[in-house]
Amino acid sequence: MAATHLTSTSSLTINTLPSFEGLRSASGISKINVSVAYPSFTSRSFRGLVVRAASITTSKYTSVKPLGDRVLIKTKIVEEKTTSGIFLPTAAQKKPQSGEVVAIGSGKKVGDKKLPVAVKTGAEVVYSKYTGTEIEVDGSSHLIVKEDDIIGILETDDVKDLKPLNDRLLIKVAEVENKTSGGLLLAESSKEKPSFGTVVATGPGVLDEEGNRIPLPVCSGNTVLYSKYAGNDFKGVDGSDYMVLRVSDVMAVLS
């Protein structure tokens, strides 16, 4: 019986895509004759192939019990319109970063100590962007996160009242200059974001290898310099800018 060959060759003409320099297309399209060897698969070989986002899983369940130091949060509903009633396009709708804790795990073991989760069921919390796994429970959006992904507890609608967790700090960002030294007003987009501010609140500290809390080296009232692209930024009710970051992102205390 003659053997069946799984490869074949053919001559292809490939048009290379144009490159872009800024917004100007670089001219020139070249043709390349290529001899290619490829398996002769049928279309049936690709049936059932589904590409999904690896970081997000959405399923429908009626009960979810977090394990270890994980926390189940019922997320706030995305605002689809402004306070004046104008509907926002999907791209302009801000993804919520807060919600209510509805279930917690048993905690984690550090050294010889078994430490409970730092937040309780019913607490209103704020968590880091782009974290956790989304899941639908009883028709509502929920998020499963690790305790360390929770920034702090917020019992009001104003971020200035945030109680940071672990090694995090709440910082009120220094105000940006509205004018140049020559008196010209600066456009909002041209204002350079400052990387220093005043510490408003601190977390209880980091855990050592034995599960004991180590106090943070900064305290409320300190003016600190921090890494430019660190942390999560928030806007207070009065329009003030706030930053929540880890103490390891603080470079110096200013005085």
Swiss-Prot record:
Renumbered residue ranges of the record's region Cpn-10 domain 2: 157-255
Region entry Cpn-10 domain 1, spans: 54-156
This protein's UniProt keywords: Chaperone, Chloroplast, Plastid, Repeat, Transit peptide
GO cellular component terms, A-Z: chloroplast; mitochondrion
Subcellular localization, as worded in the UniProt entry: Plastid, Chloroplast
Gene Ontology biological process terms from the UniProt entry: chaperone cofactor-dependent protein refolding
InterPro entries: Chaperonin_GroES, Chaperonin_GroES_sf, Chaprnonin_Cpn10_CS, Cpn20, GroES-like_sf
A Pfam family matched in the record: Cpn10
PROSITE patterns the UniProt entry points to: CHAPERONINS_CPN10 (PS00681)
Primary location recorded for the protein, binned into one broad class: plastid
Top-level division of the source organism's lineage: Eukaryota
GO molecular function terms attached to this record: ATP binding; metal ion binding; protein folding chaperone; protein-folding chaperone binding; transition metal ion binding; unfolded protein binding
Transit peptide: 1-53
Family matches, as SMART domains: Cpn10 (SM00883)
Oligomer and partners: Forms stable complexes with CPN60 in the presence of ATP.
Protein task: Seems to function only as a co-chaperone, along with cpn60, and in certain cases is essential for the discharge of biologically active proteins from cpn60.
NCBIfam families for this protein: PRK00364.2-2 (NF001531)
Record-linked HAMAP family: CH10
Recorded family membership: Belongs to the GroES chaperonin family.
Name of the protein this chain belongs to: 20 kDa chaperonin, chloroplastic
Gene: CPN21
